[in-house]
Amino acid sequence: NVTVDWIIPGETHTADNFAPGIEAAVAQGYDAIATIAGDAGVAPFIDAAVEAGIPVATFNSETDAPNMRLLFVGADLYLQGQTAARAMADAVGGEGQVAVITGFFAVEAHELRRTGFTDTIAAEFPNIEIVGEVENTDQGDIAFTQAQDFMAAYPDLKGIYVTAGGPFGAAAAVADAGKAGEVQVVSFDFVDETMQYVQDGVIYATIGQNPYAQGHDPAIRLFNYLVAGEVPPCARLVTEAAVVTADNISEYWTPAQ
């Protein structure tokens, strides 16, 4: 018999929230732990759990700080940022002003997506100017206001890149301003609000990361490790990063009935 408990330690992917959650799971005697590892501060708590005999898998976000986790399941986040940069370049015709809205500057996963984007723009698309970078704490309403502010400050703005949560807020601002197709949005994830804006032509592209696998694989592989000593075939299981646009959205999403 197996029981999987879903614990939400806080609203941000930082050690301030996740470290106490890992400590609590250790204290409560869980046999294994799967956790987001959003910043380096989580690493010593992962190590403490492993040293207490509790295997740990990380998913979605992984710190670069060395730690004793068994495996990571998630996207190559820097590569996702590079993919987003090329999608944006396609959307804006390789030139113009682009703004960046990230979730948290302190979350390593968001930084990888941000720097993958900005590095690629600088290296491959010299005619694209990044006019500003702000954080929205993964909130759609904040992204809405920030997108409005960018469009007001830069009347010739051609694109908005959202690295993490709340891209539908930026898309709503673009739609409300009557600038769908004029200000292009590139984002991540296949949540319904985002996919509707893709279908409507407001979001040019959104990039997936297979969240089902990120939930499924850590649980199954930790179970197999516990009961059979089966070690995962590799320490990093990288999920697919499909790029969805209005042209192929029917392959990935159907509107809710």
Each PLM stretch: what is its role?
Residues N1, N17, Q80-A84, E108-I128, ...:
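Short, solvent-exposed amphipathic alpha-helices that sit
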Residues N1-T14, F18, Q97-V100, I121-G140:
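Short beta-strand elements in bilobed, periplasmic/extracellular small-molecule ligand-binding domains
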Residues G10, N17, T63-A87, V100-F104, ...:
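Short beta-strand elements at the ligand-binding edges of bilobed clamshell
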Residues A19-I22, A32-E51, F117, G132-M195:
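Hydrophobic alpha-helical
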Residues A40-L79, Q97, V191-Q199, I203-Y204, ...:
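Flexible loop/hinge segments that line or gate small-molecule binding clefts
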Residues F72-V98, L112, A143-F144, F190-T194, ...:
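Hydrophobic alpha-helical segments within soluble ligand-binding/sensing domains
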Residues F105, A109, T120-A122, N210-Q257:
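Hinge/cleft segment of the Venus flytrap/periplasmic-binding protein
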Residues K158-G159, A172-Y212, I220, V227-V231, ...:
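Exported/periplasmic ABC-transporter solute-binding proteins
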